[in-house]
Amino acid sequence: MEISWGRAMWRNFLGQSPDWYKLALLVFLIINPFIFLANPFIAGWLLVAEFIFTLAMALKCYPLLPGGLLAIEAVIIGMTSAAHVREEVAANLEVLLLLMFMVAGIYFMKQLLLFIFTRLLLSIRSKMVLSLAFCVAAAFLSAFLDALTVVAVVISVAVGFYGIYHRVASSRGEENDMLDDSHIDPHYKTVLEQFRGFLRSLMMHAGVGTALGGVMTMVGEPQNLIIAKAAGWHFGDFFLRMSPVTVPVLVCGLLTCMLVEKMRWFGYGETLPEKVRDVLQQFDDQSRKKRTRQDKIKLIVQAVIGVWLVTALALHLAEVGLIGLSVIILATALTGVTDEHAIGKAFTESLPFTALLTVFFSIVAVIIDQHLFAPIIQFVLQASEHAQLTLFYLFNGLLSSISDNVFVGTIYINEAKAAMENGAISLKQFELLAVAINTGTNLPSVATPNGQAAFLFLLTSALAPLIRLSYGRMVWMALPYTIVLTLIGLLCVEFTLAPATEWMTQAGWLATLS
């Protein structure tokens, strides 16, 4: 029997999302106009809370859909205007170009990155050294590339290796279903569980590595570019200004990596079973024998393009997005990727998040028009200049751990810049606050998958169910990093940031906005 029209519409609305989630969004959409008529300020804050809710519930439904509906309604009822949204998008065009072109560009360098991580996995036998190598490699790559792409590469390595061993363990060849363990011998199951634990720990180390490296440079995370643009910093300026906080945090993060592996705390410490290593080594040997001269040239070309990418970013030869576009052109032209559909696949990872970021800017426009953060900013600015840094760091960290750090970073840097332009704070203080905001949004956000896009990508990937990586387990395994990164970051903002910045300014290392 066919369902009713009403039931059909309900099923189509937000698709497979739970009924309670659909109902909650409908309630939001119904009550918002009435609350806006009664009190625009409260309605604005309610909209922000609703939007954060959609980000927190990203596993129920991709936030672009519910967040987009809320943003469209906000424009319709007059909380902001389409013209203001366009202005916000135009002001942040560099970030959108970064996401569109840089992520797509790195897609065409995946073979090189896969080669690097595969060699790491099979050539290093010590689990502690291997974990450290994955963390350092992810941190270095994320300082120049997009963290999402780095995690995507590590995921593809892990899925590939898991599939190879699972096929051997199940004896089902190409017909093997990686989610089905029913055909696996009990002995193999024990080895498989150990292998899952090994992959879980490596993925978490790599994920945290992207946060450690991503906070250090203006291209490491999307919000970094927004903050750098607001402060007028180039690549070198940004790195130096962040270093009083980010370098100690990096060192302590790597020490934490070694400690949890050594002590086998928080689900870490599992080693790669020898039986699995033998299977993977055989597969890698076969792959290397099959690698043609053409394949080897592709790897060399990608490595040269990687050098160009790092050089162009460091010397600020063009806007970040345009450098990414040059990577796309060079990588496709020199490796023989000429089909439109093959090129189009490179954009599938970045465009949904680019669209979501545009929705962010709509909510930012509402925040500006309704002066939502004015009371918070006034409260913070009433404190001493020294205390302001700590408060900005903590407020950013708290919000970033439950919401998306791009959203939070954009809001706070806009408010801090407005305060400087209004004469409430000095230029010198604004530049210190920009560092506190950047580190506050990047470091504590490793607490949950909601804060780091790369973590959320890992949680929603095909790998997560294979290695039994749930939301709760991810939060638990991230906990030691969350504590160390947040506390060390706070101490550095409190004690080392101002004196180190002053020393670098006097030494002539730092340029200042005029």
Swiss-Prot record:
It is a multi-pass membrane protein. The keyword Ligase does not apply. It is found in: Cell inner membrane. Pfam families: NhaB. GO terms for cellular component: plasma membrane. One of its GO terms (molecular function) is sodium:proton antiporter activity. It catalyses: 2 Na(+)(in) + 3 H(+)(out) = 2 Na(+)(out) + 3 H(+)(in). Keywords: Antiport, Cell inner membrane, Cell membrane, Ion transport, Membrane, Sodium, Sodium transport, Transmembrane, Transmembrane helix, Transport. The chain crosses the membrane at residues 23-43, 63-83, 97-117, 120-140, 144-164, 202-222, 238-258, 303-323, 357-377, 391-411, 447-467, 475-495. The keyword Nuclease does not apply. InterPro entries: Na+/H+_antiporter_NhaB. Na(+)/H(+) antiporter that extrudes sodium in exchange for external protons. Belongs to the NhaB Na(+)/H(+) (TC 2.A.34) antiporter family. This is Na(+)/H(+) antiporter NhaB. It comes from Salmonella newport (strain SL254). The gene is nhaB.
